Amino acid sequence: MAQSTTSETHTRDLDRDCTTLSRHVLEQLQSFSPEAQDLAALMQRIGLAAKLIARRLSHAGLVDDALGFTGEINVQGEAVKRMDVYANQVFISVFRQSGLVCRLASEEMEKPYYIPENCPIGRYTLLYDPLDGSANVDVDLNVGSIFAVRRQEFYDESHEAKDLLQPGDRQIAAGYVLYGASTLLVYSMGQGVHVFVLDPSLGEFVLAQSDIQLPNSGQIYSVNEGNFWQWPEGYRQYIREMHRREGYSGRYSGALVADFHRILMQGGVFLYPETVKNPTGKLRLLYEAAPMAFLAEQAGGKASDGQKPILLRQPQALHERCPLIIGSAADVDFVEACLAESVP
């Protein structure tokens, strides 16, 4: 009996180690069609970008030009970190010759990067935040990368990328990479949320958890309370209520990926409200809020801008910003109720 149990354990371990990103995508799509193979290859390329960024981060204090600022200001009006530039270039380099995408849109670029005509051109667009929470790099805290995959809706001859201005429910895949104690890649193609861990000995992302489900509620709220007096009253009302409730904890790291991953695993809610300084919100809709909302809903949670689901919000611009309330369904509902009650 003991030998049988040991054998079954070894079989499960081998099955897990053999479930790589590309294999998992093909299993999810239940197809070996050219489109399915392209999506599997695309996800594998995202994994390659993650490995390169993870390697650079692990040597951040030992190599030149990894820490600190470049002295430039990006399209968002934010000071550019050296690792922002590196991570953005990694994604471009990984996909330029891949034949999988026609363009890439990033937080770090005012306009999308179009694959040159002398390179193979694919049918997909990758939208991404190359290094979320990059202010954490210099103090060795968690950071991440966020991505979303969309089909090209029509031929973009004018290079205005207007077909990208579609609600988040048009995404065909979304996910993030968390660079921390281990490197995790979390993704969904509309069939649940799945977690992969980078195994350094194999050099591969292997499946760690399938079909993650967000608890209906949790006892964690994640928000930068330093902005308390800049928020609309409904958010302040919610925080006051959390302070009164026993057992609730505030956790905030400054990286959306890290904070959302905690919520995904343990339940609760992440908030990034609009403020007096940023009346339309701070997070970017297309490559931060919408990908995370896609994951939250696939895991049984919710994501809202305070008035409507994030995935139903119609973007008007590539770098459009929005408020974000995301996490366990009951907790998001409660925040929305606080906002509704505060409206005169």
From Swiss-Prot:
Signal peptide: none annotated. Pathway: Carbohydrate biosynthesis; Calvin cycle. It is an enzyme of class 3 (hydrolase). Mg(2+) 1 binds at E107, D129, L131. InterPro entries: FBPase_C_dom, FBPase_class-1, FBPase_N, FBPtase, Fructose_bisphosphatase_AS. Gene3D superfamilies: 3.40.190.80, Fructose-1,6-Bisphosphatase, subunit A, domain 1. Belongs to the FBPase class 1 family. PANTHER family: FRUCTOSE-1,6-BISPHOSPHATASE-RELATED, SEDOHEPTULOSE-1,7-BISPHOSPHATASE, CHLOROPLASTIC. This is Fructose-1,6-bisphosphatase class 1. It comes from Synechococcus elongatus (strain ATCC 33912 / PCC 7942 / FACHB-805). The lineage of its organism: Bacteria, Bacillati, Cyanobacteriota, Cyanophyceae, Synechococcales.
